[in-house]
């Protein structure tokens, strides 16, 4: 049997390999499309959207002249616009229906064509392919960090400030005020608003209340120590019952997703992870080492386990996990799984344990307009504005789940939301909700963070290796960003 390489060399090799993969998957986009001199891309944006307006404006009559940053409306007739998104299943089917409805009802003669990318990374690859491709989109629904990247590194995304604030073709002040400030800020860079929130989601902890009560726990955990105690109790029961098949299960299913790791870090008190000029990630902090060590102790003691499949919802329904970490959009799937597997257990969702306040971290998809011709940009914006109307946002919320992106959308979806106790619970966490890092570099940093966390949980890595892992974590993020010109 071969001896493994020294730990420092091994960690460095893994992080370098991670950097290579990320450079391949996240290469900067190609040359930006050629934009006519009269396009909206030539207009300097000046509207600040970080402060919501206090009240709505009255309905106005149609203008007699087209604003300078728009095109004559007659030029919109016959414009064919491609809308690409990462949704699938029922949500993608609903998007198809909405696009068809827009095509039939819009007064400008705009024709939208929808393209299902399949995933956010596939969509990024499509944009990276350049505007000469036949399926290159003019409007997208994409993660905020991707929109920010296309704005800052490639000049592919169009700032929307002027369009949003236009008194006739923009969003009303009330519509802007209805969208939570934290959602607006996720799509901002240097005063430019590059996106309109479409769907927001967050990692949550699924928790089996019935099983926990049988284990002797009357209340859900509110601290990390409580969380570990309950997970260990569930693991002990499964390892000492008469069924050998469930040995090694029962606690928390390990989830190394970057946003889940970031949520754990925030629950342990991570601060100032973005600092400097330009902003850089700083995860090499004592709190990160403490967080990694806590989860590692759960793994070492058998209270957290790596699942063989991605079906955490089924493990949960079968009492092979007291906890697992999923997304708010997974609520319908878990309900259907419990019904299918005939589980009678009561379950709920929890924020990440902090002890003082609920810790939740929100991210998601936003509508964005990619640079093209002036007529295409205007047509794309009018579709985004239509999709962002409260009634359409409410429909997307009802179909795709997640958090309401505006107060008006929440009110319109109130009946369905109130029928789901877990959904109602999530709304109560809105006041303390935190944002995923609202910077373009998060699309890189989240995967490097994920890899470093995974390394810290391996049996051949010792606690003494953690400082090196964290040092390499920050260095690798900087290295990959530099390779991509960021």
How would you name each of these model-derived features?
Residues 16-20, 26-75:
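Ser/Thr-rich, Proline-interspersed low-complexity disordered segments
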Residues 63, 67-73, 144-202, 344-351, ...:
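Hinge/lid segment of periplasmic solute-binding proteins
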Residues 101, 105-178, 213-216, 315, ...:
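Extracytoplasmic "Venus flytrap"/periplasmic binding protein-like
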Residues 177, 347-350, 398-451:
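Long, aromatic- and glycine/proline-rich binding clefts that accommodate carbohydrate-like moieties
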